[in-house]
Amino acid sequence: TKTWNVAELDKISFATTKNGTAVENQLADMDLNYWMPDTVTYLTRSDWAGTFPKTYENLTATNEMVDVLDNDTYEINANGDPSTVTFGADNGLTLADLKGVTDLSDERWGLLMDQIDLEDGMIRLGFGGTSTKAIESIMSPEAIQNDGPNGINSYTLGQYANTDTSSGDPCAVDENDPNLTYKFGTMCNETVIAQTFSKELAAEYGKVIGNYSLWSNLAIFWGAGTNLHRTPYNARNHEYYSEDAMLTSGQAVAYITAGQEYGCIIAPKHFAFNDTEINRTGVAVFMTEQQARENELRGTQASIEDAGALGIMTAFNRVGCYTANAHTGLLMNI
């Protein structure tokens, strides 16, 4: 046995990220002890017997927790002046003009938004699922979307396929092709692929998805599933690779990298902490930030940093008491 001791705490080496951003806690409010001090004892190697997990029952949310859980944060200004909002302006911009512009303070983003007609904006916000509707005023094309981690299952091959074989499109499908009625939700699930421990096989899966995207005009694919198997009773476990963060990361990176070679955006989900199917819309998930960063978030982190994933599907649950799709620490800072 070799023992290694640190003479004194190093507060410098890991104080900033590679780009100089200060490393700070972002999920402190995900710890139940943040809301109810000294309620939960977390397992530690230094005291296995004294800190081994137990079931916590009969806990009552505090008034502060209830206020946040209610999520009643939208304030309606009865005296607002809608004339200050511009629709349908002629500013001569297209969405493509802002390709690569990541600075949201760039005034061109505001000018571009001013060009959108009210009706087009409402359609874009109100209709989703299998398609992000086109906005002609800014030349934003329709983007076909589909689920999920175990194969493309939201629509058949022919629903959005190009059936004009005279168009010059090498992926056009004859309108009489019997495969147009095929729904590609037939792949084995991610758990089975992960059990092979083969990144090569995961990459082959990605290639199949990418190739199919060309024939079906698929632009955005909601997969891979990068959550962990935190409990055997999670009905979404079949969409996630494993209980191990590193195995999940390796599989997801191979899959996404290979699939995106075909031009399809592959967006991992459900970000983050989706560990149940029943009541998953709104259930409050609590854990320490260490647990989140070292385990739960690793698969998505690798998908972005190592595979270059260009999209993410957020989860329906809460991060502590806050909704996952509105938690600033999770979505903006981490």
Task: Cite the ranges covered by each PLM segment.
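Glycoside hydrolase catalytic-domain context in secreted enzymes
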Residues: 1-334
